[in-house]
Amino acid sequence: MNFDVNTIPVSERVHITKNLLRYGISIDQETGKIDYIKVTTVPEVRCESIHLIRHAETEAVAKHEFMCDTSNNCGFTASGIEITRKQAAELDEYNFDIALYGPIPRVVNTQLIIMERPQKFEAIKVHKLHGIDNTGWEYKSFDELCNTPLFIARELENNMFARTPSGTSWGMVIANCVDVLDLINEQYKGKRVLLISQGSVLRAFQILLRKRKPPWDDFTVEGMYHVGDDAGKKKNYGVIDKIY
């Protein structure tokens, strides 16, 4: 049995489709797959730069488990805290004007670690800076989920509409990031912006700003720490990435 996109409200699918279209991204209404529209003009990004720090490494990552926004496995590992503090000590060289951080506890707590050290910028919470919520999958392993229609649709077939009943889809994460870009363009023109959020938000910005060709150039599960041996995988929790 395949995932049925009709289980997702029409209003939600329309919102996702319209927001992605603003950045020249089409979405197939049956498969949920996205692609860049070749001849299109996308909105200008008016800030000077955008960087993102992903939340600190969590216990869920260390245990190869999924987590939701509020699950008990979202606490940070000792190494995760250490890495984030080290990154926080190096932020002066970027001369950020403002930091925007997401609303969920592990992101809020990462922001608190960063701001423990006196910084030159203010940090402001932004509700739309919200990545994937895996409610319904928390504490589960890859092996427990990998053969389910929903997991196959969301993580292997890259269906932008697929989500758990109380979670969020990749399409909604990207649509939310369109709204964040609107906010940046309206309020932080010419500024150096730091985002503190989740890995799914990093991917969403990379897709919107065409840093990936095609927009979805891999299976997300290949980089998941839930899958197999993570010894050879680059752990970028608590570490800064340049988006724009």
Give, region by region, the residue ranges found by the protein language model.
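Active-site metal-binding loops of divalent metal-dependent hydrolases
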Residues: 56, 199-200
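Surface-exposed helix-capping loop/turn segments at secondary-structure junctions
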Residues: 93-98, 186-193
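Phosphate-handling substructures
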Residues: 59-63, 71-75, 116-176
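Active-site catalytic microenvironments for nucleophilic, acid-base chemistry
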Residues: 90, 113-117, 183, 187, ...
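Active-site-proximal alpha-helix that buttresses catalytic centers in soluble enzyme cores
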Residues: 2-119, 168
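Acidic, low-complexity terminal tails and accessory targeting/binding regions
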Residues: 2-49, 132-144, 186-191, 206-244
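General small-molecule cofactor/ligand-binding pocket signal
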Residues: 51, 124-127, 241
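Short beta-strand scaffold positions
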Residues: 101-102, 175, 196-197
